[in-house]
């Protein structure tokens, strides 16, 4: 956590050491890791502000959420995480990344969210029929703190190719068609809402 002033100078910070775990063939963090990490970072920040300036922060002019780009968090209609968070370190999406790269004529890295979703569909994973939306770690934290499905354009660029402040429309249609042929009928704009609501 970093606190800056109105001239963008850092005036305090807080941190927590954490490391992802390799479980069941997947690099992951648990929701408890995520929630506890945020709380610990903020507590450390607040205590550092108190130590340096003699006060605890009570309000802020603005806040921003930044986390590791890419990865895959799939949720059902009740906001339940369907499979453990798959971080950017995972290299289980080679087939999907290759097929999407060929389909779009645009390099899709294995770590991108769309590659993870596409691979889950290819693998006919049990959770796929229950997906209501997907998100990244930063998008998830933003949703938890603000109840809004939004990601910045930088974060969005690790989900699906972007153009301007949205996802590249000419790539959406062939991707949706290919997914539909494999039984996944959601539109990309619906998974998550942040596909079309970028900050």
Locate predicted features.
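Phosphate- and other anionic-substrate recognition elements at nucleic-acid/protein interfaces
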Residues: 101
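Gly/Ser/Thr-rich active-site cleft segment
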Residues: 104-198
């Amino acid at each position: 956590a970093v606190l800056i002033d109105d001239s963008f100078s850092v005036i305090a910070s807080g941190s927590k050491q954490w490391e992802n775990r390799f479980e069941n063939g997947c690099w992951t963090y648990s929701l408890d890791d995520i929630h506890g990490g945020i709380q610990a970072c903020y507590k450390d920040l607040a205590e550092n502000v108190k130590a340096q300036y003699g006060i605890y922060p009570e309000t802020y002019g603005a806040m921003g959420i930044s986390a590791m780009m890419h990865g895959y968090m799939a949720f059902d209609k009740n906001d339940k995480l369907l499979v453990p968070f798959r971080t950017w370190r995972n290299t289980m999406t080679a087939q999907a990344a290759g097929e999407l790269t060929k389909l779009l004529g645009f390099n899709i890295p294995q770590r991108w969210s769309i590659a993870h979703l596409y691979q889950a569909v290819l693998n006919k994973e049990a959770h796929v029929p229950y997906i209501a939306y997907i998100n990244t770690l930063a998008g998830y934290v933003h949703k938890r703190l603000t109840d809004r499905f939004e990601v910045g354009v930088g974060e969005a660029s690790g989900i699906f190719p972007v153009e301007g402040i949205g996802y590249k429309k000419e790539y959406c249609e062939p991707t949706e068609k290919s997914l539909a042929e494999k039984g996944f009928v959601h539109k990309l704009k619906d998974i998550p809402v942040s596909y079309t609501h970028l900050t």
